[in-house]
From Swiss-Prot:
InterPro entries membership: AceGlu_kinase-like_sf, Asp/Glu/Uridylate_kinase, G5K_ProB, Glu/AcGlu_kinase, Glu_5kinase, Glu_5kinase/COase_Synthase, Glutamate_5-kinase_CS
One GO term of the biological process aspect: L-proline biosynthetic process
Species: Streptococcus pyogenes serotype M3 (strain ATCC BAA-595 / MGAS315)
EC assignment: 2.7.2.11
Enzyme class: transferase
Protein name (database record): Glutamate 5-kinase
PROSITE patterns: GLUTAMATE_5_KINASE
HAMAP family assigned to the protein according to its UniProt record, in alphabetical order: ProB
Keywords in alphabetical order: Amino-acid biosynthesis, ATP-binding, Cytoplasm, Kinase, Nucleotide-binding, Proline biosynthesis, Transferase
Key word Protein biosynthesis present: no
Protein family (similarity comment): Belongs to the glutamate 5-kinase family.
Primary role: Catalyzes the transfer of a phosphate group to glutamate to form L-glutamate 5-phosphate.
Length: 273
């Protein structure tokens, strides 16, 4: 059996999706955010370096503007996200302050990491914030990102963004929180005998083909984007855990080596019992 070894992990990127932050009613899950802030603050107190990639701007914006569903018009989507981003960061700042942890905001577009000069600048910004003991909270800059073919500003979703951030910050581990328990051998919502994959060492075509489907009603990322993110992590010689974000305290259990979720780590680097 493959044993998870995280004793040497210092820098961690945690990605939380909209479905983990927003209740099915559309209201903000305050308890979940408080638990997440507690866990991250606890890790910081233990000497870990944590970067949070947080979706949720659209969900927060819909709640504030009392809109029941995501608008289809691009300009309105950007407006809703812009309103929601301010509210989300305000709440994060308040809740993290309760645990005496300071946070900052970094909004990225894909062109920032494509061009060497801007990539160097944002990398230096991450390093400076981390050196100050601050938790950078990262999101895509939805108010200016566009999804057209002649533009290079949009990542696509925050699953991919979290993999990019893990790469440019040379993180030891990416923990992706979602509304699913991990990667299954088949769709668990359709097949009762679906089995959770505890460890994935290679992203095969079979895995890619089985990872169909879109994201939640408030978010954009589905299983395919998570698999693509894991592939990006592999290309950077990193590792990732995909796990259910229902209880953020499970992050601490994962770091203790407990086999929760799916661990993505290339086979040549895996240590055996």
């Amino acid at each position: 059996m493959m044993k998870r070894q995280f004793e040497d992990v210092t820098r961690i990127v945690i990605k939380i999706g909209t479905s983990s932050l927003v209740l099915p009613t559309g209201k903000i899950n305050l308890e979940k955010i408080d638990q997440l802030a507690f866990v991250i603050s606890s890790l910081m107190n233990k000497g870990k370096e944590v970067i949070l990639v947080s979706s949720g701007a659209m969900g927060f914006g819909l709640d504030i503007l009392k809109m029941e569903k995501r608008p289809t018009n691009l300009a309105k989507q950007q407006a809703v996200s812009s309103v929601g981003q301010v509210a989300m960061m305000s709440l994060y700042s308040q809740i993290f302050a309760h645990y005496q942890t300071n946070v900052s905001q970094i909004l990225l577009t894909r062109d920032v990491v494509v061009f060497p000069e801007s990539l160097a600048n944002v990398t230096n910004a991450f390093e400076s914030l981390i050196s100050f003991g601050i938790v950078p909270i990262v999101n895509e800059n939805d108010a200016v990102s566009v999804d057209e073919m002649d533009h290079a500003t949009k990542f696509g979703d925050n699953d991919r963004l979290s993999a990019v951030v893990a790469g440019i910050t040379k993180a030891d581990l990416l923990i992706m929180l979602s509304d699913i328990d991990g990667l299954f051998d088949k769709n668990p919502t359709i097949y009762e005998d679906a089995q959770l994959r505890s460890h994935v060492a290679v992203i095969t075509q079979e895995i890619i083909a089985s990872a169909g489907g879109a994201g939640s009603k408030f978010g954009t990322g589905g299983m395919l984007s998570k698999i693509q993110s894991a592939q990006m992590v592999f290309e950077n010689k990193g590792q990732m855990v995909l796990m259910n974000g229902a209880n953020p305290r499970d992050i601490l259990r994962v770091l203790e080596g407990q086999p929760l979720g799916t661990w993505f780590k290339q086979i040549e680097e895996v240590r055996h019992d």
